[in-house]
Amino acid sequence: MLKTIATKIFGSRNDRVLRKLNKVVKKINGLEPAFSALTDDELKAKTAEFRARLEKGESLESLMPEAFATVREASRRVLGMRHFDVQLIGGMVLTNRNIAEMRTGEGKTLTATLPCYLNALTGKGVHVVTVNDYLANRDAETNRPLFEFLGMTVGVNIPGLPPEVKRAAYQADITYATNSELGFDYLRDNLAHSKEERFQRQLHYALVDEVDSILIDEARTPLIISGPAEDSSELYIAIDKLIPLLVKQDKEDTEEYQGDGDFTLDLKTKQAHLTERGQEKCENWLIENGFMTENESLYSPAKIGLVHHIYAALRAHTLFERDVDYIVKDGEIVIVDEHTGRTMAGRRWSDGLHQAIEAKEHVKIQGENQTVASITYQNYFRLYEKLAGMTGTADTEAFEFQQIYGLETIVIPTNRPMIRDDRTDVMFESEAYKFQAIIEDIKECVARSQPVLVGTASIEKSELLSNELDKAGIPHNVLNAKFHAQEAEIIANAGYPGAVTIATNMAGRGTDIVLGGNWRAEAAKLENPTEEQLEALKAAWQERHDVVMKAGGLHIIGTERHESRRIDNQLRGRSGRQGDPGSSRFYLSLDDSLMRIYLNEGKLNMMRKAFSTPGEAMESKLLAKVIASAQAKVEAHNFDGRKNLLQFDDVANDQRHAIYAQRNDLLDHEDISETIKAIREDVYNEVIDQYIPPQSLEEQWNIAELEKRLKQDFALDLPIQQWLEEDNQLHEDNLRERIIASAVEEYQHKEEIVGAETMRNFEKGVMLQTLDELWKEHLAAMDQLRKGIHLRGYAQKDPKQEYKKESFQMFTEMLDALKLTVIRTLSRVQVRTQEEAQAEAAQQAAAESKDYADDSASGERSVAQTTQRIGRNDPCPCGSGKKYKHCHGNRAAHEA
């Protein structure tokens, strides 16, 4: 109450920010006459002037009015578009690490040029982040003439580029890229074996387009680079035959209720659970089919992997639907993004789920993968020094943006008043009645030449509605994951008089639907169009535009409410752009997913009783409250899930930072001998401590085992017992010094044979490869720890604290293992002179009567490893960083 009164008196926080920014807008407008009078060369020279002023200590904030005035004038001359005042406000909001909510059609692409130019003046690079390749290319090509006029370079980074092209894109002042490619390049950079292989420079400023889609909808999707793991495709095929034998049970077993089913489903979390009866049935089937013996249990340590396969197959059959969650295309399972309706080629579900779905659909099962590197979008984008975003729908998620990313959401006013008619939701008892009403609404719109955009929640529903429209004889276009290639053309035609377009969720997002159609898209199809042709296209468009305006603009039909209000608002936002007329209405039924999953049986029964006659439509304030309540529950549940994920991932993120910082330090230094020296001393001291405890008596020493360990692990054959017998003055400290000195002497001897440069390369290669291998194993161990950590709650322990504690212990153990493995590998490598290598080669040739060409016949000294000492998977001693089997080991085998 008091807050409402205060807001009325003083205005909201948003109002106060806008009032402050309007003062700067007046200042920019005041500069316009002077900047309009500048010649092109004088306007271009402003970029060099601004950079010089920055170097002298001026801030970006003080340069902002002049920089924005420069961009506005350049845009007017080059693109023929002048920034509106509200776009200047949007640009200022984006400069100040905020999120700008700008309605559809308000010109976000043009607005982005302002903060991009300003932040690119620093020379540190700007990343404009889009959700797909099409938008990255489109926006870059649209704004390239403007930026190049002002002396800025523009790059585009999308999947599949050659390394040199990708590297050049990152060196540009302004780089347009997809969110996934930026994240993957970051991971690739941290798997590189030389600094020349890296792509990204310092992460300075990111402007995220459709920020809600990337930072919220995809927040729980980790980016993973993986390598092959053990193949178990036959097991997936076998287990797939078990699932149809299992029977669903509606409720979990309790003391009061004992069901007769084999499994239960949790539709909210998309999880399946076996009942006791189900476990017994699975065990019996596994025994009958030879996967287990009668003495074994499904949960015995040796068979626990079978549980993983059963649950993956169970989820594949019961919770993931074809043409809803995925499609089958060219013999592969392709995931469909639940938020956008777009396919996500190249992405795979983890934990064996993707393989289980491949078995279910009888397509080729691709091997499981082991994670080599991973990061979430939440943690990747928090690496940027400055982060900003823009979207048409952010205000409903403002709290989450503030909590997770520290970004304030500012709602930018529209250039013209929004006059769209958002009508009350209509509820029907069943989906069949709902579709009948939708068809009637579409018929009425088509009759008066009003274009219609129908939003559906899945491919399945879009095709079902398409069939109904075919029966009714209504021409229409379908835009879903199956017709992704035709997206731009379908959207370009969606504003034609009487056009009917069915789209899954927000397929086509990022492209405006122009009333009357897009004449520019038509012009683009013509080869070298004449002025007369262009004028004819414009005239035809104007005629169609007037017809659509008179009919009421674009009409939006939602076929069901989404889990999030934001997605519903995105659908509505396709209509009423830049003051155009428009309308929207959602048609709902009690069969909709939101109703079935998130409303209890009592509320559903109460609503069913409200329908007195078949096919009756219901509109009421109570209905709106029930739907809002269900959506609020889902949004809160999803926010908690993302926040919980971040809290766990932050633990791994701290470790990731430490490892990647260490790795980059290695790449940036040619000589790491001092690091190796320090590690060697630590490792030998720790090993010696195990057999000669500090401040212990000589009787407590285990010299025989120490000699054995040094020889076995470090190829160091030292007569320590003999030293002690010959020298009574030897005590713990000077004995320790003598052992380490012997190790150093042995290592220096190897270095003298092969040369310092070769040894430095070898040290670096061993260090990098060992670090990568142990980090990969650590990620797998962390993943297993995380999957089971929730069980600690049953022991009255906080799972998050337990996870932090145990993961830190595992990380410490990994670092210790890194030191030991590096020193062990460097110590065990055997080197020999060129003459020795040639002599051995000659002996082998004589013994086997085969020609053998020595790889190092150039006369230079080289590193070689004996087969007893270096395994095929050990680092190659040449210093390449590759495994021996992929480097000189492979070459030697080929030549032999």
Curated annotation (Swiss-Prot):
It is an enzyme of class 7 (translocase). Zn(2+) binds at residues 876, 878, 887-888. Residues 565-584, 840-896 are annotated as: Disordered. Keywords: ATP-binding, Cell inner membrane, Cell membrane, Cytoplasm, Membrane, Metal-binding, Nucleotide-binding, Protein transport, Translocase, Translocation, Transport, Zinc. May bind 1 zinc ion per subunit. One of its GO terms (cellular component) is cytosol. GO terms for molecular function: ATP binding; metal ion binding; protein-exporting ATPase activity. Monomer and homodimer. Part of the essential Sec protein translocation apparatus which comprises SecA, SecYEG and auxiliary proteins SecDF-YajC and YidC. Part of the Sec protein translocase complex. Interacts with the SecYEG preprotein conducting channel. Has a central role in coupling the hydrolysis of ATP to the transfer of proteins into and across the cell membrane, serving both as a receptor for the preprotein-SecB complex and as an ATP-driven molecular motor driving the stepwise translocation of polypeptide chains across the membrane. Belongs to the SecA family. This is Protein translocase subunit SecA. It comes from Mannheimia succiniciproducens (strain KCTC 0769BP / MBEL55E).
